[in-house]
Structure formats: C-alpha cells, structure tokens
Curated annotation (Swiss-Prot):
Gene3D superfamilies: 2.60.200.10, SMAD MH1 domain
Pfam families with a match to the protein in the record: MH1 (PF03165), MH2 (PF03166)
Key word Lipid biosynthesis present: no
Stored CDD domains: MH1_SMAD_1_5_9, MH2_SMAD_1_5_9
MH2 domain boundaries: 271-465
Similarity remark: Belongs to the dwarfin/SMAD family.
SUPFAM superfamilies for the chain: SMAD MH1 domain, SMAD/FHA domain
GO biological process, one term: regulation of transcription by RNA polymerase II
Name of this chain's protein: Mothers against decapentaplegic homolog 5
UniProt domain MH1: residue ranges: 13-137
Region annotation (Disordered) ranges: 163-242
GO CC terms, sorted: cytoplasm; heteromeric SMAD protein complex; nucleus
Comp. bias (Polar residues): 173-183
Length: 465
C-alpha cells in the first residue's frame, strides 16, 4: 500500500478514480501519465468524464462515444512514446497485452471509430472489441481419391506457377492496389472454388509504435502515409473474420464423412521462423517468433529481446561494401504482426521493403511470383489463414502434388532497401544485399499432416524434371 500511496500522492482525484479500473500491474507511471493527459482533454467537454466513468464502471451497459480531437498523424504522445489513442486506452482499461491496432475492431454503436477519419476519435474502450482468430474448418482428406478434378482457379493458379517468368512482376503499394484488379486467369463456370477477392484489397494502416507496440520506438516514427476509405476497411475486416460459410460442403457435395479423414489446424508454439540472408549466403541462426508482434531491424539489442530480431548483431566475413551500405539503411526495419489468423508487414524503415508472398498475390489477383513494394509508413496483409485453408481444402481433391505445391505459399521473402524483379536490375532475391525468409509454421505443419494422411504421391516428387 505504501508504494501505491506514494505513486498517487500528486495525482488528481479524477485520475485516481479512472486508474481504479486499470487492468494489469505493469507500467504504472506510464498509465498514470496517459490517463492524466486524457483527463485534461475531457475536462473541456461537458459530460465526457461522467460518460467515461459510466462506461468503465458498467461494462455490460450501453455507453456513448467518449472522444478527443484527432491529431495530424492520428497518434497521441504519452511520455516519450507515441501510439494510437484508442489502442492506448484499450490497453489501460481492458487488454494490457494489446500489441497493435490490427487487434481491434469498432462496435457498430461507435459513431467516431478510429478508422472513420473524423475530426474526433472515440477512446471509449467498450466501443471496441478484440479481433479473435477465426476457427479454421478441418481439411477433409479423401480416403480413396476418385475425384475428377475440373479446371478450377487453384489449377490455373498452379499452372501460372509452373510457367514462371524469367523475372518476377512488380507492384507498388498502394498505387498498384487501388485500381480494380482483373484476375490474370479465367475462372471455369463449373469451378467449386470462388474467385480470389482481388477487388477487396487491404489498405495501408497507420504506423503504430509506442504504447500500442512493445518496442518503445522514438516519437519520430514515420506518420501514416495512407488511410483507407471507411467502407473499404469495414468490408475487409468483416470479410476476413467471417467463418460461418466454410468451403467443405461446396467442395465435397457427394462424399460421405466415412470416406474422409478430417485434419485440423493447430497453432504451433512459434508462429514463424525468420532466416537472414546476404546475397545467397545465410547469415546467423534462425529467429523463432513466439510473440505475435515481431520487429526485424538493423540495430543491435544487447538485452536479447525475444520480440526483436536485430540484424545489426550478425557478422559475415564475406560482406562487401554494397551489403554494408544497405545494412546501414535498414534502420527500424519491418514490424510483423500475426493477428486474427492474418500476417501483416509494416514498413518502419525510411526505405521501402519488397515482399514476395504468393498468398498476398493470390488475394490481389497478381501473378504468384509478383514482388510488392511497401513504402515507409505503410502496412500490407501478406498472409491470410482462411484463404489458405480454402485453397488447401480444394487441393486435397487434386492429389498429393497439388497439396505439396502449397508449401511455396507458406514461405515469404522480403528484401530491405533494394528491390528485385522486372523493374529492377536484380532479377532474383538472392541478388539483393539484405533479405529475410519467413517460414509460417502453422500452415506448414498443417500441410505436413495432410500430406501424411494422403500417403505417397502418384508421381513421386524428385529433383529430376
């Protein structure tokens, strides 16, 4: 009690009352400063303090929006850290382990949600809900493969992979993503698989740092470069979280449950591993991500933070001047989030990052090997578990090789500073000075279990073509 008393000795009664509803016991001083800053803003608005106290004291009861003015870059500075206001106060009063704005979705009753770009933003923590990971339906593996595969979207997507161009295509975010995309392959009218949601692109999201992130970045992180249209953000979120309409009945209408073996998805201990390369040389050990929010940067971190993969620590005797110069420009690097069954890459570096993700390319209707440029301050969804689950559910009916082909979708390559592909003089990722390879463990382990259940391929996979 003595320590608590000394903590609140110079705290106003209003701040004391609001801190009474604080969740968790970490960062007491920071929470006090965050609440104090909020009280100063709310005192200027009649009834705002009362409405906030009502919401905090009666969580199950309806409450009104509690708003503060939106800053120029949408963020709020508390102490030496910047973050998005709704994330800060949801973290104080509801979820102390909240990592990112990607984990929050506004309720329908909220009139001033953060994503609506209005002059005021609602910070009522009970006007937001936490995005939950969708429950993926098990893949039903036929015990006896008598399925006659038709020309479906999956087959045509795979055929494109087999006829890969000498150099990958390039796309720049958000420019290449804003025009209505036409799928580069035609869809058979009899295909049981739906078209990729190419027109439903996921827009950039504001750079989040400070309280909404465990990394305590300085206050001068890049401001958001692009904000999504209101309806676009809402549509994408609601679509990606809808698990009610699974693909099983459509894919296997005439197969009884006795003829199939269900294989369920399980979350692994480490959701991904990251390997760092310089040109075609692997450097250092693989980083295994246990936290759902990981920073890969160019600095050194003597504290061995499990949420950070610091490339500045890694040495390579074969390093040339181009690599050295590129490493100096990695800076704050990339922030990887795994939220609600989706993986996002957020560019915190002053230089762009370049991503090759077959899952992302499928979603946007790009060629499978397309390399997407993500400028500083932008973030892009680079993997969606639900879309992968749908592709896997269909591919089991096309045989072992079709499922095995999906392993390529579970590896994402990302280059710092320097791009590669048709628009760059570097043709391959192994020609870029500094790049990482991200292996998604959950999807890979799911594939492994499905392949084990399927048995041997009809045409054994070998190195001989």
């Amino acid at each position: 009690m003595t320590s608590m008393a000394s903590l609140f000795s110079f705290t106003s009664p209003a701040v004391k009352r609001l801190l009474g509803w604080k969740q968790g016991d970490e960062e007491e001083k920071w929470a006090e400063k965050a609440v104090d800053a909020l009280v100063k803003k709310l005192k200027k608005k009649k009834g705002a303090m009362e409405e906030l106290e009502k919401a905090l004291s009666s969580p199950g009861q309806p409450s009104k929006c509690v708003t503060i003015p939106r800053s120029l870059d949408g963020r709020l500075q508390v102490s030496h850290r910047k973050g998005l206001p709704h994330v800060i106060y949801c973290r104080v009063w509801r979820w102390p382990d909240l990592q990112s704005h990607h984990e929050l979705k506004p309720l329908d009753i909220c009139e001033f949600p953060f994503g609506s770009k209005q002059k005021e933003v609602c910070i009522n923590p009970y006007h937001y809900k936490r995005v939950e990971s969708p429950v993926l339906p098990p893949v039903l593996v036929p015990r006896h493969s008598e399925f006659n595969p038709q020309h479906s979207l999956l087959v045509q997507f795979r055929n494109l992979s087999h006829n890969e161009p000498h150099m990958p295509h390039n796309a720049t975010f958000p420019d290449s993503f804003q025009q209505p995309n036409s799928t580069p392959f035609s869809i058979s009218p009899n295909s049981p698989y739906p078209p990729s949601p190419a027109s439903s692109t996921y827009p950039s999201s504001p750079a989040s740092s400070g309280p909404s992130s465990p990394f305590q970045l300085p206050a001068d992180t890049p401001p958001p470069a692009y904000m999504p249209p209101d309806d676009q953000m809402g549509q994408d979120n609601s679509q990606s979280m809808d698990t009610s309409n699974t693909m099983i009945p459509q894919i296997m209408p005439n197969i009884s449950t006795r003829d199939v073996q269900p294989v369920a998805y399980e979350e692994p201990k480490h959701w991904c591993s990251i390997v760092y390369y310089e040109l075609n040389n692997r450097v250092g050990e693989a980083f295994h991500a246990s936290s759902t929010s990981v920073l890969v940067d160019g600095f050194t971190d003597p504290s061995n933070n499990k949420n950070r993969f610091c490339l500045g620590l890694l040495s390579n005797v074969n390093r040339n001047s181009t690599i050295e110069n590129t490493r100096r420009h990695i800076g704050k690097g990339v922030h990887l989030y795994y939220v609600g069954g989706e993986v996002y890459a957020e560019c915190l570096s002053d230089s762009s990052i370049f991503v090759q993700s077959r899952n992302c390319n499928y979603h946007h209707g790009f060629h499978p090997t397309t390399v997407c440029k993500i400028p500083s301050g932008c973030s892009l969804k680079i993997f969606n578990n639900q879309e992968f689950a749908q592709l896997l559910a269909q591919s089991v009916n096309h045989g072992f090789e079709a499922v095995y082909e999906l392993t390529k979708m579970c590896t994402i390559r990302m280059s710092f500073v320097k791009g590669w592909g048709a628009e760059y003089h570097r043709q391959d990722v192994t020609s870029t000075p500094c790049w990482i390879e991200i292996h998604l463990h959950g999807p890979l382990q799911w594939l492994d279990k499905v392949l084990t259940q399927m048995g041997s391929p009809l045409n054994p996979i070998s190195s001989v073509s």
